[in-house]
């Protein structure tokens, strides 16, 4: 007796780039039969007319902040589930919003809408050891402490180390390398970074990240290239990364499908000179929380928000969409949301990225190929994270599945209402159990915390 059977679906074979018309048989959290499945099942989903995809994997997003949710509600985890994501990677851009141990304990105790893995963030570690001036290098004593804390996090099960170089200008190249003292050369880990500077400085930033990868001898993920290089130099940036890879440095890249980025208004991203670099003005910045929710800045509001509300999320409409599409289509680039919310406010990418890619760029604009898009949201990130049982619909693999209506799938979240649910996601299955049934969330506690190597 099967636990769950999905029948009459258009099963996406990502590896062979084809559609298999048929069924999936699921038992004990895994796919055990494919094709024409005759075995009886406790539950049956009729997926006729719908695509059956591996659950989407978001390799770059930003987890809940328990100081805001008080551990009483789900924020971004809920929006991830709504768009068909089944596994996420937290702790990006150098920033853990709480300790990895706390995140793990919360999920193991209460469950979660989606599965999580996590980096340990360099910027987070700096705060833990008292290196709180973002414009100053850490002392050698602080670096020694961070070296030990990095190893402890890796031993606990962290994916690797993430950096927020732009957020903390005091992190120089030497410090970024030095904190990896006890983990260098480990091919089972992954480093990632939010670049040093964007736009006219993007190529220098890419070279710096390549140098970190070279010196640490650890595979490296360049985060959200779209917000680094979609200012007139995306072609050059992609070519540079290709050449770096040809020289034996293990780099990969992710990007999100929006021409605006989001971060805290008080961050160093908005330091003096940013508008000149982007060739934009104050009115390209929209604030997302009261007392300025939905307000586009002038100089006075911009400076007031930076001073009085530094943790407020802002949206910067400063990138070129044609270069976003160029990045999304490049063979090295996988798709990730970079989603982040504060009190349910923020950027719509955290609720719309994956449906937007399929609905807008594949179906409507025809600027991406279907199998390429699915690969970039499933198998590519699974391989990069060394997930042995995720990213494919295959016998023996985890039954993490998204079922969608290709004709209807689309993002609905906006900058004014950034957590609106997408359309077209019919079912989501985590570990063989139904989380979303016929478009309705029926179980939001199926997710678990995976330590590195467990999935």
Give, region by region, the residue ranges found by the protein language model.
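Histidine-centered catalytic micro-motifs
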Residues: 55-66, 165, 191-197
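Divalent-metal coordination cores built from histidine and acidic residues
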Residues: 52, 61, 71-162, 182, ...
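C-terminal cap of metal-dependent C-N hydrolases
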Residues: 318, 325-332, 337-338, 401-450
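Divalent metal-coordination and catalytic microenvironments
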Residues: 9, 24, 29, 49, ...
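Acidic, glycine-enriched loop/beta-strand segments at the rims
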Residues: 12-23, 314-318, 324, 368-374, ...
